[in-house]
From Swiss-Prot:
Entry annotated with the keyword GTP-binding: yes
Domain TrmE-type G: 221-380
Family, similarity comment: Belongs to the TRAFAC class TrmE-Era-EngA-EngB-Septin-like GTPase superfamily. TrmE GTPase family.
EC number in record: 3.6.-.-
Organism from which the protein derives: Nostoc sp. (strain PCC 7120 / SAG 25.82 / UTEX 2576)
Cofactor(s) for this UniProt protein: K(+)
Name by which UniProt lists this protein: tRNA modification GTPase MnmE
PROSITE patterns: G_TRME (PS51709)
Subunit structure: Homodimer. Heterotetramer of two MnmE and two MnmG subunits.
Annotated transmembrane regions: none
Lineage: Bacteria, Bacillati, Cyanobacteriota, Cyanophyceae, Nostocales
GO cellular component, one term: cytosol
Length: 459
């Protein structure tokens, strides 16, 4: 994949009438020339690398001032892309940054593709592919723990073990190929030692694969649906949990007509909480739509909080809803326990195969900590700490690791079957290639396109 031209893009979020600063980034061989054409730095300011200049951005023909700005100059290779890079730090909003970007394009730059700045950093050797993916994860992080995990990946915490595993495979391959080329000059291979080495590599791959589910939780979060009969306190539960009045709460059944969402973080995991309409038979057409959306939310959720009224106990309505959601991971929330005598709470009946039960008094904001603990237990993560999550692979990396492990298992089978040495090398090369795809040492252009299309244009 070739690097062509000088690229430019807006590097900050564009929000109308918001944001005090907007940045236009330019990278490539013509970046400094474009900056010198557009930027007027008064006085005796020196155009040196890694200095900030103050001045005015002017139209190159009319010399009309477009914006008062700062210019950051970074000469190759000491820049994000390892090319010459300039950044115009303009006033925020839409107009100024769009005008500056347009002047850059008219002066010889082209609009950057999504992720092209990071792609150039990868192609120029500043980042490997795991670090590039970690940048996207860091930008999109939805919790402090997710950001910390992404930062660990950016610092090479994943790349290092992958490179070591690949190097170990290359060492084994070199031993085998040496016997193929110089069989008469070298002692025979120790089959058992090679199998042992391969088993050790496969075991380390398995350890990396075990981080996939935790990584996905940190990246995509957990979707939790609160379901139950009308007026059991679902909206009160959402409000108490989110510490806000996200949902309307009344004593009238059917108040919630649509799905209400709230974004939370539980034990480092981003959680999307869905407060749904009470599920019941109704002739109200609007409420019917809400009930159907409740069922859809329950069927697509990662976890269902089946909420019941402890004051009325388990009803036929609760049983009907339970039959609809029992195939999903489920926590039974016994709400309104403040309305029930303490000695009666433990005698409340419910289906025997429900193993996770939480007692809450949502209107009094009681039981939320117990609910969060139960959620962390049911997703089998425990309290996620940043130190536990230094390694967390994504789906692409997991697929490559799985392929590498399968190839190594095939090498073991080939050795056990006492096939010729040439056969040993075939699957070993497959494992080496799969590991190389993770860091980018062996990767196709289509894979790069797919990875970097996730990025915003200015990154």
């Amino acid at each position: 994949m070739a690097i062509t031209g000088t690229i430019a893009a807006i590097a900050t979020a564009i929000v109308p009438q918001q944001g005090s600063v907007g940045i236009v980034r330019v990278s490539g061989s013509q970046a400094i020339a474009i900056a010198q054409t557009l930027f007027d730095a008064p006085g005796k300011q020196v155009w040196e690398s890694h200095r900030i200049l103050y001045g005015y951005i002017r139209h190159p023909q009319t010399r009309q001032i477009v914006d008062e700005a700062l210019l950051l100059l970074m000469k190759a290779p000491r820049s994000y892309t390892r090319e010459d890079v300039v950044e115009f730090h303009c006033h925020g909003g839409i107009i100024a940054v769009q005008q500056v970007l347009q002047l850059c394009l008219e002066s010889g730059a082209r609009l950057a593709q999504p992720g092209e700045f990071t792609l150039r950093a990868f192609l120029n050797g500043r980042l490997d592919l795991t670090q590039a993916e970690s940048i996207a994860d860091l930008v999109g992080a939805r919790s402090p723990q997710a950001a910390q995990t992404a930062l660990a990946g950016l610092q090479g915490k994943l790349a290092h073990p992958i490179r070591q595993l690949r190097a170990n495979c290359l060492d084994i391959l070199a031993e085998i190929e040496a016997r193929i080329d110089f069989e008469e000059d070298l002692p025979p291979l120790d089959d058992e030692a090679i199998i042992s080495d391969i088993e050790n590599i496969a075991a380390e791959i398995s350890q990396l694969l075990a981080t996939k589910d935790k990584g996905e939780l940190l990246r995509t979060g957990l979707k939790v649906a609160i379901v139950g009969r009308p007026n059991v306190g679902k909206s009160s539960l959402l409000n108490a949990w989110s510490q806000s009045d996200r949902a309307i709460v009344t004593d009238l059944p059917g108040t919630t007509r649509d799905v209400v969402e709230s974004q939370l973080v539980v034990g480092g995991i981003p959680v999307q909480v869905l407060d749904t309409a009470g599920i019941r038979e109704t002739s109200d057409q609007v409420e019917k739509i809400g009930v159907e959306r409740s069922r859809q939310a329950a069927n697509t959720a990662d976890l269902v909080l089946l909420t019941i009224d402890a004051a009325t106990g388990w009803t036929t309505g609760d049983q009907e809803i339970y039959e609809q959601v029992k195939h999903r991971p489920l926590i039974l929330v016994m709400n309104k326990i403040d309305l029930v005598e303490k000695q009666l709470i433990t005698s409340l009946e419910y289906p025997e195969n429900i193993t996770q039960i939480v007692h809450t008094a949502a209107a009094q904001k009681q039981g939320i900590d117990s609910l969060e603990t139960a959620i962390l237990e049911i997703v089998q993560t425990g309290k996620v700490q940043a130190a536990d999550m230094d390694l967390a692979i994504n789906q692409r990396q997991a697929a490559a690791l799985t392929q590498a492990k399968m190839s190594l298992e095939q090498v073991q089978a080939t050795i056990t079957q006492q096939l010729p040495l040439d056969f040993w090398t075939i699957d070993l090369r497959g494992a080496i290639q799969a590991l190389g795809e993770i860091t980018g040492e062996e990767v196709t252009e289509s894979v790069l396109d797919r990875i970097f299309s996730r990025f915003c244009i200015g990154k």
